[in-house]
């Protein structure tokens, strides 16, 4: 089993926002030592989830972890992502696709907010 990771974001009409997601995916690969990491977007960015799955499969990944890059649980994570992931799993039965839990409430987010607050407030 060869692992691959997808950083899955909403996507934006503002290309710099999509580039930021691509940078996060690249940094995850670099810091984690994961050779197969791709960004994917629900809408307004490329590739979409299926496109990223196919990119990873072409590199040899057979077990793909989709990490939602959304701050809170909403309809896209509750309804859309599971449906899309299931459709892709049904289409490519030789691939194992797992969706990680959302960032929603992760303690690391509090640290990021504290860092921001401390950089502006005494």
Question: What role is predicted for each listed range?
Answer:
Residues 1-122:
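Active-site-proximal alpha-helix that buttresses catalytic centers in soluble enzyme cores
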């Amino acid at each position: 089993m060869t692992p691959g990771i997808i950083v899955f974001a909403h996507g934006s009409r503002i290309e710099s926002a999509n580039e930021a997601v691509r940078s996060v995916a690249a940094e995850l690969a670099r810091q984690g030592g994961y050779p197969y990491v791709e960004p994917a977007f629900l809408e307004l960015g490329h590739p979409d989830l299926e496109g990223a799955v196919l990119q990873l499969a072409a590199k040899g990944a057979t077990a793909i972890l989709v990490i939602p890059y959304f701050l809170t649980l909403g309809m896209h994570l509750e309804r859309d992502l599971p449906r899309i992931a299931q459709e892709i799993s049904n289409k490519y039965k030789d691939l194992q696709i797992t969706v990680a839990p959302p960032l929603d409430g992760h303690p690391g987010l509090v640290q990021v907010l504290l860092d921001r607050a401390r950089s502006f407030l005494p």
